[in-house]
Amino acid sequence: MGAASSFHLFWQLPAAARDARLVEVLAVVEILVPPRVPALYFWALQVDFVGPAGMWGGGHTGLQWNRRYPGNTAVNWGGYASADRGGAVLPGSISALPGFDDDPNTLSYPWSAGRRYRLRVHRSPDIAGAWRAEVTDMESSKPTVIRDLWPGQPVATNRIRRYFWRAGNASEAGAEPGFLARPMVWSEVFAECGDPSVTVRWSELTAVDEEGIAWRPDAVSVNYQAERDGGCQNTDTRPDLGGGLLQITNTSRAFPQGAGIPLH
């Protein structure tokens, strides 16, 4: 028993990109076999926010299977300040998507199993120092803005701003723009280890630097949450024949902790 918890794919970017100042990160996710239980599932693209003085924090955006929302489908863009900045939830804008006042990070979004969705994090065109996440249905090519986060601002300043910002009338946050680092994708699952198997597919992992150069990881390294910390022994990550990466629950584990999976 226990929770399937978290398993991650850390991107191994080419050596020439490791010191690049990243300003955009993208990944495509597809829910191939959707959940069949009411537990929460979250499939996300994660980045660190880095400024001149070090790390500001991290953010994650992705699709959720969440029974609080119509059809159990939702999207999220949220994150936390770094420990030396207090570790608080990062402030951000009010989304145009429907949601709940007590959780501005998670919004209703009608994703469907078997469709491909591109997750994208980039500098906000509306607010200086903010980072925007959007999701695009690859069949319709329709992008949907989720919201903006302000990782570089003091949390106390933006906590007030968060509740009054609306698209089109925001004042500039005024933070230094910073850049992105350490991209990864992951699954976080709050189901039992023995619940019906779920499969998601990741592809088109891409990072773009401030010179406009697009970088693809050479490989990913696999990480599983330890069983003693609530992880399951029957989660797995494996490549497919189309160049994608599958994350699967309730299956045999073919790629162990720390394994590398080449992408070229």
Predicted segments — roles?
Residues 1-91, 106, 249-264:
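Secretory/extracellular carbohydrate-interaction modules
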Residues 32, 124-126, 188-193:
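Short, flexible beta-strand-to-coil junctions
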Residues 92-118:
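Short, aromatic/His-centered strand-loop micro-motif at the edge of beta-sheets
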Residues 111-146:
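Carbohydrate-binding surfaces in secreted/extracellular proteins
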Residues 165-195:
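Active-site-adjacent segment of 2-oxoglutarate/Fe(II) JmjC oxygenases
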Residues 183-226:
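Exposed low-complexity, polar/acidic, P/S/T/G-rich flexible segments that act as propeptides
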Residues 212-264:
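Long, compositionally biased interface segments
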